């Protein structure tokens, strides 16, 4: 019984946003800060002010001055939101679904190298959540193509469903399950549920093998909100408006629940 309750704790550090766009906005924010500090007195500004503390009239003055000064150029006044949305801690039901959980564990550590057929790293680091459906789920883990059309596993491609995982229910927000294309077609793709209540339509069709730890649920909330910033949801309402990337991942430890 103790072995059935074995839990492995893993983590996914998620970045949300376009890195190039973020770097550009950060540079423009620094432009504004540097101008205020070095030349703000020419506009009658307190040089100790932060860009975000300027009123609209002051912002217009700085914007116009920087546009005509080749040393500075474009500016933004509000500091861009950090790319790092936070850490999701996942509790894997290793006692109930040992094969599925071992596959996931190895994919977060990257310890198995590259796939024999795919020749791609068996590692979630750098993978995107390519599909996010508001109030339903977010799906990622395609270590081969990154777009949800493929996947791989430490077992050399597809592996079978574990019956105990098929019996577990999607009981609420933060359930961790295996994405598939039918019976016994598990690879590396997985999903996290975003629905507050049960998702009975998924029960018995997908292997449930873990959950988000309660302390990580606020991070999930933040990721879902930022995924649809500005109301853009892709052509079919399933694409995040900005990239959601697993920037880091690993194992935290093992315990009995």
Regions from the PLM with identified roles:
Residues 1-257:
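Cross-family detector of peptidyl-prolyl cis-trans isomerase
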